[in-house]
């Protein structure tokens, strides 16, 4: 009896050991499968994240490109504005210079005597006739516009030279400018010099006794 009982216990323990071993093997198999599942899911998640990262990178590059283009457009616009402003300043400076020259010429003309102004007008009339004759010639050559501008500049330059020469013979006294006459003009424009004999005769006549002034 005892020997059979011992044998039964041994068989039972062996069976238990075999069952435990089988369970351990099952656990190992399950754990391996879990690892495989986890690893496969990680790979899938990595594959899913890759397009997102690529999308973010491409979106960032596109935004940076748009910012760069916008900055270039702003720089170009600023450059055009500076160029436009510079041209406007140059035009304004030219106009201001022309106005100042015109004002100076008008002041000089206003300070000159009427006789000299008449001489200038006569010279201008002669220049106008000369320019009209040249204008007809240039019309024949189909260059009227350019030549008219050249003639206008020539007349203006000649007029300035005339005024400049006239200013040499004038002296400014306070707010007025006095024209100095040449020796050839003295006898025509200045009054005659006083004669002492004539003055004495006039005084005697005015102070004669017949008047009885006393």
Curated annotation (Swiss-Prot):
Q: Which GO terms describe its cellular component?
A: 90S preribosome; nucleolus; small-subunit processome
Phosphoserine: residues carrying this PTM: 16, 45, 65, 144
**Region ranges (Disordered):** 1-106, 182-214
Biased composition (Acidic residues) is annotated at 42-52
Domain of life according to the entry: Eukaryota
Q: What are this entry's molecular-function GO terms?
A: U3 snoRNA binding
Keyword Lyase assigned: no
Q: Which GO terms describe its biological process?
A: endonucleolytic cleavage in ITS1 to separate SSU-rRNA from 5.8S rRNA and LSU-rRNA from tricistronic rRNA transcript (SSU-rRNA, 5.8S rRNA, LSU-rRNA); endonucleolytic cleavage to generate mature 5'-end of SSU-rRNA from (SSU-rRNA, 5.8S rRNA, LSU-rRNA); maturation of SSU-rRNA; maturation of SSU-rRNA from tricistronic rRNA transcript (SSU-rRNA, 5.8S rRNA, LSU-rRNA)
| Protein's cellular compartments | Nucleus, Nucleolus
Enumerate the Pfam families for this protein.
Answer: U3_snoRNA_assoc
**Which keywords has UniProt assigned to this entry?**
Nucleus, Phosphoprotein, Ribonucleoprotein, Ribosome biogenesis, rRNA processing
Q: What else is known?
A: Present with 2120 molecules/cell in log phase SD medium.
Subunit structure comment from the entry: Part of the small subunit (SSU) processome composed of at least 40 protein subunits and the RNA chaperone small nucleolar RNA (snoRNA) U3. Interacts with snoRNA U3. Interacts with MPP10.
Q: Which family does it belong to?
A: Belongs to the UTP16 family.
Q: What job does this protein perform? A: Functions as part of the small subunit (SSU) processome, first precursor of the small eukaryotic ribosomal subunit that coordinates the first two steps of ribosome biogenesis in transcription of the primary transcript pre-RNA and pre-18S processing. During the assembly of the SSU processome in the nucleolus, many ribosome biogenesis factors, an RNA chaperone and ribosomal proteins associate with the nascent pre-rRNA and work in concert to generate RNA folding, modifications, rearrangements and cleavage as well as targeted degradation of pre-ribosomal RNA by the RNA exosome.
Name used for this protein in its record:
U3 small nucleolar RNA-associated protein 16
Organism for this UniProt entry: Saccharomyces cerevisiae (strain ATCC 204508 / S288c)
- What would be the name of the gene that encodes this protein? BUD21
């Amino acid at each position: 009896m005892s020997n059979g009982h011992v044998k039964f216990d041994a068989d039972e323990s062996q069976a238990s050991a075999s069952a435990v071993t089988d369970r351990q093997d099952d656990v190992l198999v399950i754990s391996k499968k879990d690892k495989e599942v986890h690893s496969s899911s990680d790979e899938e998640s990595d594959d899913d994240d890759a397009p997102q990262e690529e999308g973010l990178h491409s979106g960032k590059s596109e935004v940076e490109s748009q910012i760069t283009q916008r900055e270039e457009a702003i720089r170009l616009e600023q450059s055009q504005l500076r160029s436009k402003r510079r041209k406007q300043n140059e035009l304004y400076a030219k106009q201001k210079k022309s106005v100042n020259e015109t004002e100076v010429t008008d002041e000089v003309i206003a300070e000159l005597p009427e006789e000299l102004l008449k001489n200038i007008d006569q010279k201008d009339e002669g220049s106008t006739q000369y320019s009209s004759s040249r204008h007809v010639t240039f019309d024949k050559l189909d260059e009227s516009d350019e030549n008219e501008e050249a003639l206008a500049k020539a007349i203006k330059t000649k007029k300035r030279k005339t005024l400049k020469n006239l200013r040499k013979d004038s002296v400014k006294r306070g707010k007025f400018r006095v024209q100095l006459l040449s020796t050839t003009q003295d006898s025509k424009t200045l009054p005659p010099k006083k004669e002492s004999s004539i003055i004495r005769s006039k005084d005697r006549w005015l102070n004669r006794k017949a008047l009885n002034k006393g």
